Amino acid sequence: MGKNLKLKMARVEHDMTQGDLADAIGVTRQTIGLIEAGKYNPSLALCIAICKCLDKTLDQLFWE
């Protein structure tokens, strides 16, 4: 699992910190950091919550 640069770029486009995104979806900042670093495999429900918050699709953020 590589770094999730797509997630980081989408978060930055929305002018959100890792903490802002974490608060918006109900997880810790560390969880967002680990997902972006490719060290944590989020559940489908968490992926969907992130996508809704960032106005992106699963394809755009998580799948190639």
Model segments located where?
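Residues in the helix-turn-helix
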Residues: 20, 31, 60
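DNA major-groove recognition helix of helix-turn-helix/homeodomain DNA-binding modules
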Residues: 45-60
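Recognition helix of helix-turn-helix/homeodomain-like DNA-binding domains
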Residues: 27-40
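Short amphipathic helical patch at the helix-1/turn junction of helix-turn-helix
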Residues: 1, 12-13, 40
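Short alpha-helical elements of helix-turn-helix
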Residues: 5, 29, 43-47
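Short amphipathic recognition helices of helix-turn-helix/homeodomain-type DNA-binding modules
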Residues: 62-64
